Amino acid sequence: MSAPRLLISIIIMVSASSSSCMGGKQMTQNYSTIFAEGNISQPVLMDINAVLCCPPIALRNLIIITWEIILRGQPSCTKAYKKETNETKETNCTVERITWVSRPDQNSDLQIRPVDTTHDGYYRGIVVTPDGNFHRGYHLQVLVTPEVNLFQSRNITAVCKAVTGKPAAQISWIPEGSILATKQEYWGNGTVTVKSTCPWEGHKSTVTCHVSHLTGNKSLSVKLNSGLRTSGSPALSLLIILYVKLSLFVVILVTTGFVFFQRINHVRKVL
């Protein structure tokens, strides 16, 4: 199985499971997978509810649990719980969506409800016990499914757009041919819009745009409007008609004026 298909399969499992985080196996209403201790690179779909699990340590052995949260463009946030005094403390934590799953003395896992592009970053849970310290880190990558659309432009080209995806989507064409241009537009929330333009000349009447993305692939087809090759756009045709009519009117006006002035000159000569 290829890497993109494997990742898509993981994302499908993420969206389909429902349970709680137990025994080192993270399972949430929208999100599930198995983690070992250490650092994990984790893709997560935007707008789901995600739970990040601590190392599977029994609460009776817990002394202190600390979550370190490092988000892009923000100061490091720390959420801590001390069992002896049943005290919680937060430092530089301003994101309201990132909270404990429940009371830290009952569940030390962290939840994000729901995930947004601003939650990209590194999360590490550190558990202090009489037997030593244990940690689990997550490199969280938020994925955004792009909106795909395909249309024909006025200059006999096909235009395919993958709007606000994260990461940037890849666009290919069927049948394969020369691509006029592929442009990427970056937005402040980390998403990217990809626009690809393909000439229609030399192709059949139908072309297909194939968009590849970590969240899934999508293909759209469009059939060339045969009238587009000869008559151009409706606006252009209207302008041509108006131009012809105006030209005829000017010719008639000039001819009539010329005849009128000729008659006046003839009458003056007779008098």
UniProtKB/Swiss-Prot annotation:
Q: Which GO terms describe its cellular component?
A: external side of plasma membrane
Ig-like V-type domain boundaries: 46-132
The chain's Cytoplasmic topological domains, given as residue ranges, are: 261-271
A GO biological-process term: regulation of neuroinflammatory response
The source's superkingdom equals Eukaryota
| Signal sequence interval, chain numbering | 1-23
Intrachain S-S bonds: 160-209
Limits of the Ig-like C2-type domain: 133-221
Pfam families in UniProt? C2-set_2
Tell whether Acetylation is among the UniProt keywords: no
Where in the cell?
Membrane
TM regions (residue ranges):
240-260
Task: Write out the GO MF terms.
Answer: signaling receptor activity
Question: How does the UniProt record describe the way this protein sits in the membrane?
Answer: Single-pass type I membrane protein
Q: Which residues lie on this side of the membrane: Extracellular?
A: 24-239
Glycosylated where? Answer: 30, 39, 86, 92, 189, 217
- Which keywords describe this protein according to UniProt? Disulfide bond, Glycoprotein, Immunoglobulin domain, Membrane, Receptor, Signal, Transmembrane, Transmembrane helix
> PROSITE patterns, per this entry?
IG_LIKE
Instruction: State the similarity comment.
Output: Belongs to the CD200R family.
Purpose of the protein: May be a receptor for the CD200/OX2 cell surface glycoprotein.
Q: What is this protein called?
A: Cell surface glycoprotein CD200 receptor 2
Originating organism:
Homo sapiens (Human)
The root-end lineage is: Eukaryota, Metazoa, Chordata, Craniata, Vertebrata
